């Protein structure tokens, strides 16, 4: 038993926020699963770093450049292969839990963030190309992305809805998921295999606020927001309306805590793992945070602790004139821009 097994027993999955060919082929990912890691997430920045720093890509990049393909097609060829290989490593985990865990995420192109139909078409294409039941397509939680979520769920595709900072936008996503499930059920199709995670970003909130907050609130608001979002989640998925879908096989969306590596060196390096452990959630962590948590983290159900204090902290933040919903919109736009820039940087050497 490891601390990751203890966290899993508390109802939370720990995923790795990293993917590369070396990680899979060296057996390191398989070893992480033995320790208790339950899934993998990727994004354009992760692939950009992998392609630039992992020698195992060099020959394939050279060969792909000899083919009449666009830079994006060359990227997708390698990314799809990596995700498929990671899905294979995670398949035993996936099957051992009846399809509840063991997912690997691949993101649609960042330039589609405001294009619902384009997102749906690319998500369908990528999902088919990977060809694994434990693949999850990552879609940004813009209004267009939430529209796409509804369609993809009705298609039977598992989705990682990413770049959430807003409680209101997260609730919109739950409603879109429920509509997608209802459509699929109305068509007489199974929904039991569909898993959706709502990726709520943590450290970027504190990074944006800590320069403007009084000392006693610094490093507190992201966790407070997550705890409030979890209360929203419990209310939504505990409702009679969702219970009616659940009796027909629908799974609850799971909140996934993302951006949980600590950016401020003044904070404990496991702050955003220790503080956010709760049932029906996922935490995707970078390698360094995973190692730190295994070494000196604490497995305790903390997500439902101090909820009143969290609400008071959010109220105090609002009283200071800080609107966290306005901040959420800005942080999502910043995140989209960062992924677009990473994608451009990723494609440049593939031209």
From Swiss-Prot:
Catalytic function, reaction form: D-sedoheptulose 7-phosphate + D-glyceraldehyde 3-phosphate = D-erythrose 4-phosphate + beta-D-fructose 6-phosphate
Location within or outside the cell: Cytoplasm
Keywords from the UniProt entry: Cytoplasm, Pentose shunt, Schiff base, Transferase
CDD domains hit by this protein: Transaldolase_like
Record-linked PROSITE patterns: TRANSALDOLASE_1, TRANSALDOLASE_2
Annotated EC: 2.2.1.2
GO BP annotation list: carbohydrate metabolic process; pentose-phosphate shunt
Record HAMAP family: Transaldolase_2
Protein name (database record): Transaldolase
Organism name: Neisseria meningitidis serogroup B (strain ATCC BAA-335 / MC58)
Gene behind the chain: tal
């Amino acid at each position: 038993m490891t601390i990751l097994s203890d966290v899993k027993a508390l109802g939370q999955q720990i995923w790795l926020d990293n993917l590369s060919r070396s990680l899979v082929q060296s057996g390191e990912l398989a070893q992480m699963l033995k320790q208790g890691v339950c899934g993998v997430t990727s994004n354009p920045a992760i692939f950009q770093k992998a392609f630039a720093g992992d020698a195992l890509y060099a020959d394939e990049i050279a060969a792909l450049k000899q083919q009449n393909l666009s830079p994006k097609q060359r990227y997708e060829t390698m990314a799809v292969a990596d995700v498929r290989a990671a899905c294979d490593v995670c398949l035993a985990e996936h099957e051992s839990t009846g399809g509840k865990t063991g997912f690997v995420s691949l993101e649609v192109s960042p330039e589609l963030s405001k294009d619902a139909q384009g997102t749906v078409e690319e998500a369908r294409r990528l999902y088919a190309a990977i060809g694994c039941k434990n693949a999850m397509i990552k879609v940004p939680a813009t209004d267009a992305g939430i529209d796409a979520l509804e369609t993809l769920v009705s298609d039977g595709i598992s989705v990682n809805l990413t770049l959430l900072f807003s409680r209101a936008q997260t609730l919109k996503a739950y409603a879109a998921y429920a509509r997608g499930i209802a459509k699929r059920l109305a068509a007489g199709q199974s929904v039991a295999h569909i898993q959706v995670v709502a990726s709520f970003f943590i450290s970027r909130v504190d990074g944006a606020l800590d320069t403007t907050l009084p000392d006693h609130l610094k490093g507190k608001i992201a966790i407070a927001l997550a705890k409030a979002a979890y209360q929203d989640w419990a209310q939504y998925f505990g409702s009679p309306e969702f219970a009616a879908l659940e009796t027909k096989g629908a799974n609850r969306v799971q909140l996934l805590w993302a951006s949980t590596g600590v950016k401020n060196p003044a904070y404990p390096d496991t702050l955003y793992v220790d503080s956010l452990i709760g049932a029906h959630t996922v935490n995707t962590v970078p390698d360094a945070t995973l190692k730190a948590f295994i070494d000196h983290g604490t497995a305790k159900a903390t997500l439902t602790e101090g909820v009143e204090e969290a609400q008071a902290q959010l109220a105090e933040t609002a009283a200071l004139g800080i609107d966290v919903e306005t901040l959420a919109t800005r942080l999502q736009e910043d995140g989209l821009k960062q992924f677009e820039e990473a994608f451009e940087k990723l494609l440049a050497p593939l031209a």
